[in-house]
């Protein structure tokens, strides 16, 4: 690259801003055609995708990247099938753009409502998994937003090959190639440029490790949709159904260990602890889950439960490790969650409506649940069709961010020569 990173990113930003204006007025049929054509292009380019991905995999192995990270890079036939299906599925989702809601007549005679509109240009910064390129591009395209995608340097060849397929789809639908752009430099300065271009970029969505997200949140000059941690809790209330508690707590921890909606801390009311914790501990031990508990938990379950430190209550393990605390009240459980949690997803197991209602009202998290596993905190499971990530912020979007979360609203007013008096 002969031009500077600043000049290159400025050029991408300018092109994205221009393309966003075209995409904002594109019809639903045009956007769906682009998505379907991109899916067909991916299907036809399997050999090219494999060749590009092999370059990334070889470089990753040579650099000593951890095997788990190498696995995340792989574009296996199943992963490519998933990307193709993802594009086609997004094409079937309802288009939120242009929808007008809440129209009402006011005493002055005017009609006022709200129209859903795109955000504009969205910058996506992510690591490792090249299939995120498809997830992000498809949702941004369907919601009428141009996007600039900056994937990890370890997936550069894969991301470029995927982007070429997307742009074939855009061309077939008569949309500008700049609707979806992949940053083609691996220079880390490109990230710094992308997050400090408010004249071209309206929102940043980072997907990656805590360090990446903290840096972007600190340095960005545009709004960021993010979550830092997934410290999720299940609280087994005094009025819990035992079978439900065991089933939910098992699933919330052991279905998968790495997702951000996996339970990391289990809270149990002291009055039910002797009935629920021993059978749960047996399940966890059989599945190789390391248990860390407070003094009451260790006294009940035995010395093989490690002593939980203060850091454990804040921990997102992403591993077969679980922290357990016995509490004396619903108040104590809510206080613990709001103090130590990450405001992601928390669940109560109870048969008391009043306790459930208090939990839903007082726990300050993006998703709060009753008698359900935290693993349900997902855009697909919520009926959103797909998600670009999960936000624990209170502005602009909160929880799983699907198509609607990538839009904004503007007021629309209809009159018939009305003037204000």
Swiss-Prot record:
Compartment list: Cytoplasm
Please name one Pfam family that this protein belongs to: Aldedh
Give the main location.
cytoplasm
Q: Which GO terms describe its molecular function?
A: glutamate-5-semialdehyde dehydrogenase activity; NADP binding
Task: Cite the InterPro entries for this sequence.
Answer: Ald_DH/histidinol_DH, Ald_DH_C, Ald_DH_N, Aldehyde_DH_dom, G-glutamylP_reductase_CS, Glu-5-SA_DH, GPR_dom
Its pathway?
Amino-acid biosynthesis; L-proline biosynthesis; L-glutamate 5-semialdehyde from L-glutamate: step 2/2
S-S bonds: none
Q: What is its EC number?
A: 1.2.1.41
What is catalyzed by this enzyme?
L-glutamate 5-semialdehyde + phosphate + NADP(+) = L-glutamyl 5-phosphate + NADPH + H(+)
This protein's UniProt keywords: Amino-acid biosynthesis, Cytoplasm, NADP, Oxidoreductase, Proline biosynthesis
Task: Provide the Gene Ontology terms for cellular component.
Answer: cytoplasm
UniProt-listed GO biological process terms: L-proline biosynthetic process
What does the function comment of this entry state?
Answer: Catalyzes the NADPH-dependent reduction of L-glutamate 5-phosphate into L-glutamate 5-semialdehyde and phosphate. The product spontaneously undergoes cyclization to form 1-pyrroline-5-carboxylate.
PANTHER family from the xrefs? DELTA-1-PYRROLINE-5-CARBOXYLATE SYNTHASE, GLUTAMATE SEMIALDEHYDE DEHYDROGENASE
Tell me the protein family, please: Belongs to the gamma-glutamyl phosphate reductase family.
Q: Which NCBIfam families match?
A: PRK00197.1, proA
Q: Could you tell me what this protein is called?
A: Gamma-glutamyl phosphate reductase
Species for this entry: Ectopseudomonas mendocina (strain ymp)
Q: What is the lineage of its organism?
A: Bacteria, Pseudomonadati, Pseudomonadota, Gammaproteobacteria, Pseudomonadales
Quote the gene name from the UniProt entry: proA
